[in-house]
Regions:
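N-terminal organellar transit peptides
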Residues: 1-38, 42-149
């Protein structure tokens, strides 16, 4: 995958679809797995990332008309919790650590969040392994072979 992110609802729907599959699934982050790309990347049974790829973890954002009422903040909090819970359930990263990275200040200019390169994503437990296309395909074929037994 290589994505800058996008619609939260659509991204979470796809991530839930992938994580719920009984068939072998493998993800590979090439370039970037930013924003809602993070849940998509961890939704596979096994995830890989190339060393030069990056992943941006940040709080929920919205553009357009936003009503300045308590219900809006509550909605954002619930949406953010859905993402945190999904990532924690589908990776080795604890929810507390994901929240820390999501709300970190000082790394992104005029923004909140964290950018992880391939090594950092694996070290943090967000992604399973460093590797490229051959590694991802070998893993997938291995899963298929194991399932056939």
């Amino acid at each position: 995958m290589n994505t800058v992110g996008g619609d939260i609802e659509a991204g979470l729907a796809l991530a839930e679809l992938l994580s719920g599959m009984r068939k072998p699934t493998v993800s590979l982050v090439l370039g970037g797995g930013h924003s809602i790309g993070v849940p998509l990347a961890v939704s596979a049974k096994k995830s890989f990332i190339v060393p030069s790829a990056t992943m941006t973890v940040h709080p929920v954002r919205m553009n357009g008309l936003v009503l300045g009422v308590p219900q809006t903040l509550s909605y954002f909090d619930k949406m953010q919790e859905r993402i945190v819970r999904f990532v924690a359930d589908n990776s080795s990263m604890k929810s507390e650590r994901f929240r820390e990275l999501m709300t970190a200040t000082g790394e992104l200019v005029m923004d909140v969040g964290t950018v992880l390169d391939g090594e950092a994503a694996v070290k943090e437990g967000l992604i399973d392994s460093l590797g490229g296309l051959s590694d991802a395909l070998d893993c997938l074929y291995g899963m298929i072979t194991k399932e056939k037994r």
